[in-house]
Amino acid sequence: MNSKFQLILSTFVVIAAFTLLPRPCASIEFHRKLSSWSNGGATWYGAANGAGSDGGACGYQAAVDQAPFSSMIAAGSPSIYKSGLGCGSCYQVKCSGNSACSGNPVTVVLTDECPGGPCLSEPVHFDLSGTAFGAMANPGQADQLRAAGVLQIQYNRVPCNWGGVMLTFAVDAGSNPSYFAVLVKYENGDGDLSGMDLMQTGAGAAWTPMQQSWGAVWKLSAGAALQAPLSIRLTSSSGKTLVASNVIPSGWKPGASYTSTVNY
């Protein structure tokens, strides 16, 4: 009986000790939460309650101050602008080092490039619109926060979610029957693109890679008249693909915009 009791007691002690050990999964999750925010710098440009510049280096033009962007935009340092491949990506930004900071995150979309000044002196820098910079403030203290001019902030890359806004293909005004250029906006998820392909209509139709022209504009020089309707395949920065079948109709026009029923 004594040996049996000792065996039971030893088993209990081992189990109890095991339950007190740190759980690897819990520790990993804890550190993941700690590392979800990174440090960066922020300034602001343009009008105090404006959208930064009129359009920006990504090519979104008047869309920057209209819904759903609604002036909540940022010009990114080279590390996040990525020569235009970062256009359309979404970030949460917040500040806490100024008495006017609310500490609450606000979401901005990358629509422009910040090529100099503090954007080159820090690994990651956001030159925010006046609207977005002020949105980080306590209620009624937006002007006080903007007066600071420069802030240290925390930022986090987040999925874009444009609600019911449709994926839009804006055909460049310089397009013609054999040269096609297009800007895509309002992509959910990654928001930015790493590749784009086009497929014409007709026998033997196949996907043809497009090239980045500038900012968020992609182009294809076909050498002959393109046969519409045209389908476009998007590849996001994380490798996710999406096909917008026949999104560019027959009789398409340069400068016109066409919407898709699909989105990421």
Curated annotation (Swiss-Prot):
One of the GO biological process terms? plant-type cell wall loosening
Q: Name the predominant localization.
A: secreted
State the Gene3D superfamilies in the record: Expansin, cellulose-binding-like domain, RlpA-like domain
List, alphabetically, the Pfam families matched: DPBB_1, Expansin_C
Signal peptide location in the record?
Answer: 1-27
PANTHER family assigned to the protein according to its UniProt record, in alphabetical order: EXPANSIN-B15 (PTHR31692:SF76), EXPANSIN-B3 (PTHR31692)
State what protein this is by name: Expansin-B18
According to its UniProt entry, this protein's organism is: Oryza sativa subsp. japonica
Per UniProt, what is the name of the gene that codes for the protein in this document? EXPB18
